[in-house]
Each structure stands twice: as structure tokens, then as C-alpha cells.
UniProtKB/Swiss-Prot annotation:
It comes from Medicago truncatula. Involved in lignin biosynthesis. Catalyzes the final step specific for the production of lignin monomers. Catalyzes the NADPH-dependent reduction of coniferaldehyde, 5-hydroxyconiferaldehyde, sinapaldehyde, 4-coumaraldehyde and caffeyl aldehyde to their respective alcohols. Can use coumaraldehyde and, with a lower efficiency, coniferaldehyde and sinapaldehyde as substrates. Gene3D superfamilies: Medium-chain alcohol dehydrogenases, catalytic domain, NAD(P)-binding Rossmann-like Domain. The keyword Oxidoreductase applies. This is Cinnamyl alcohol dehydrogenase 1. Keywords: Lignin biosynthesis, Metal-binding, NADP, Oxidoreductase, Zinc. Its EC number is 1.1.1.195. Residues 21-349 form the Enoyl reductase (ER) domain.
Length: 358
């Protein structure tokens, strides 16, 4: 169907107004549905650790007011005249990006997350010159290219964290050829992304070792998530015994930390895959890499194509996210708890079931 002609479309969300990171109601305008756009009523939105970085200006790039949230699941209310992949009433997803140049090597290769002109779903400037706002809001308008199809049968609240955390671990395992059953993988850090790493790696048939700074999460890692073993990084004997045992490590730690203890765990040709957003330099001595032909690499979320592939995989394997559902009136408390790592393992905001007041 074509665009509905309205003078101005507004929506209300929860926005950070300054680096305190406190979210309060904020009304703003949305563009009308263009020919390639999808107008979405938001039902759920996941809470990511990078949202915390953004609302508090930890990376020094925040612009206010800012409506965060980039793990969006909602219902299609309207589609533009050129939209063929989606129809009114469908449940769809939107991840971290809402724009790209569509002409560079990354875009031509369908890995638009590496486009140098990508447009973030919030805290960025869209092609019309307006500031993008995220998923802690009643509704949004997104170009169809960046809208994700969700397989029937997946619960929408379960899907939300997959749109960032889920594809963040799926993408590098797929790209680096680490989907083969029988591989031995390590998951460093057991937070929102880490718990997804355990689930995805186990679904690929890998032997999974969770690596953490203490044994506080040992029981849940082994019993709740199904990890095969658990390593405490300060356990010198245990770390020595595990040397040269892993094909890869997914490093999800979002703060500065030494790399050398974990490089020693890798086999020859093993990969340490960095995923945490860290704004301080990481250090290591080169022989730790050279003497095993090991690689330190990184990966950044995933493309729309990879996300849809991951969702089909998730459905096929019958996996589920471990989430805590909250409403908008709890969001500031949720961020406080997230900052203390007090969540198992991902907050998901029930936007549809929340009340907004401005």
C-alpha cells in the first residue's frame, strides 16, 4: 500500500538528555512512510551493554536527547509502494543499522555493517538530516533493506536480543569457518553476548569452555547453559592445564583486560575474536601470536542476511534466550543493574505493554 499522507507523525520514547544516562519521556517526529519504508509499531526492544555506553557518553560521541535501543521487534503498520518483502501485520525486526551507502565493497558483499557510511539506528544523522532514534519508543520508520524477517514460531520477546547479541556471535563463527562439529571453543565473559555464545557454539556441536574471572557463574554455565567446562582466569594451574586446547575464543569482555593469558589457551592457528567495545588499548607480546600462528581478530554484529540466517538456525535448533522482561518504567533500574552485571542474561523491554507519558 502507499504512504498515508499526514502533516506530521509523532511518537514518544524514553530518551537520555545528558551523560547522567537517566531516561525520561521524549516526544519527537518520524518521517512519513516513503516508497521503500516500513512503519513499525514496536512491541519489544532488547537492552544491550552498548546502549549503556551511549547514554553515558562513555565513547565521547553521544548526542542528546537520545532514544537508545537497537534490538527492535514490532508489527508492520504500513509499507511504502516499493516494499515487497513485508506486509501489514507481520512481526519484523530491526537491528543496529538503518542505512548504508549501498555502493562500497562491504555493501556489494552484503556485509553492510562494515560500510564506512553506515547509519546507526540511533545517535546518528539520517539521509534527511534528522537525528536517528532507537527502539525504546512506540514506533519507528525504517527502510525495508534494514528490516529483518522473523520466522514464524519464534516468540518476539525471544527474538529481540538475537538481533544484536545473537548475530554478534553467529557471524564470526560462520565467517571464519568455525561451524564444524567437534571444535573446541572458549567463551570469555558470561554476560548477554557470552550466554548467546555458549548456546550457538553448543548448537554447532562444539565443546564449550566458559572462561571467567571468578567461579560465581560456574553452576549456571554448566547446568543452565550446558557448557562443557569452566575456567577461572586467576586459577594458574587450571589455565596451564588448558593451554593449547581451544580452536577459538569469543572475547565478550567490554572493559580493558590482558590478552596474553587467553592467547596461551589457543591451539596452533587458533583465533581470539574480540567483541567487547573497549576504548582503551589492549596489549600483548608478539611471540604469543607468532609462535602458534595465532590470530587476534574482531567482528562486529552481523548483516541483515546473516541475521535472517541465524534466526532460521535458532528456530531449527529449538534454542531460547535467557531473558528478563521489564516495562519502560523499570528501564533506568535495568541500566543500573546492567552496569553491575546483575542480569541473567539480557533485559528485554515490553514496549507494547508499557505506558508512555510526556
Amino acid at each position: 500500500m502507499g504512504s498515508i499522507e499526514v502533516a506530521e507523525r509523532t511518537t514518544v520514547g524514553l530518551a537520555a538528555k545528558d551523560p547522567s544516562g537517566i531516561l525520561t519521556p521524549y516526544t519527537y517526529t518520524l518521517r512519513n512512510t516513503g516508497p521503500d519504508d516500513v512503519y513499525i509499531k514496536i512491541h519489544y526492544c532488547g537492552v544491550c551493554h552498548s546502549d549503556l555506553h551511549q547514554i553515558k557518553n562513555d565513547l565521547g560521541m553521544s548526542n542528546y536527547p537520545m532514544v537508545p535501543g537497537h534490538e527492535v521487534v514490532g508489527e508492520v503498520l504500513e509499507v511504502g509502494s516499493n516494499v515487497t518483502r513485508f506486509k501489514v501485520g507481520e512481526i519484523v525486526g530491526v537491528g543496529l543499522l538503518v542505512g548504508c551507502c549501498k555502493s562500497c565493497r562491504a555493501c556489494d558483499s552484503e556485509i553492510e555493517q562494515y560500510c564506512n557510511k553506515k547509519i546507526w539506528s540511533y545517535n546518528d544523522v539520517y539521509t534527511d538530516g534528522k537525528i536517528t532514534q532507537g527502539g525504546f519508543a512506540e514506533s519507528t520508520v525504517v527502510e525495508q533493506k534494514f528490516v529483518v524477517k522473523i520466522p514464524e514460531g519464534l516468540a518476539p520477546e525471544q527474538v529481540a536480543p538475537l538481533l544484536c547479541a545473537g548475530v554478534t556471535v553467529y557471524s564470526p563463527l560462520s565467517h571464519f569457518g568455525l561451524k564444524t562439529p567437534g571444535l573446541r571453543g572458549g567463551i570469555l565473559g558470561l554476560g548477554g553476548v557470552g550466554h548467546m555464545g555458549v548456546k550457538v557454539a553448543k548448537a554447532f556441536g562444539h565443546h564449550v569452555t566458559v572462561i571467567s574471572s571468578s567461579d560465581k557463574k560456574k553452576k549456571e554455565a554448566l547446568e543452565d547453559l550446558g557448557a562443557d567446562s569452566y575456567l577461572v582466569s586467576s586459577d594458574t594451574v587450571g589455565m596451564q592445564e588448558a593451554a593449547d586446547s581451544l580452536d577459538y575464543i569469543i572475547d565478550t569482555v567490554p572493559v580493558g583486560h590482558p590478552l596474553e593469558p587467553y592467547l596461551s589457551l589457543l591451539k596452533i592457528d587458533g583465533k581470539l575474536i574480540l567483541m567487547g567495545v573497549i576504548n582503551t588499548p589492549l596489549q600483548f607480546v608478539t611471540p604469543m601470536v607468532m609462535l602458534g600462528r595465532k590470530s587476534i581478530t574482531g567482528s562486529f554484529v552481523g548483516s541483515v542476511k546473516e541475521t535472517e540466517e541465524m534466526l532460521e538456525f535458532w528456530k531449527e535448533k529449538g534454542l531460547s534466550s535467557m531473558i528478563e522482561i521489564v516495562t519502560m518504567d523499570y528501564i533506568n533500574k535495568a541500566f543500573e543493574r546492567l552496569e553491575k552485571n546483575d542480569v541473567r542474561y539480557r533485559f528485554v523491554v515490553d514496549v507494547k505493554g508499557s505506558k508512555f507519558e510526556d
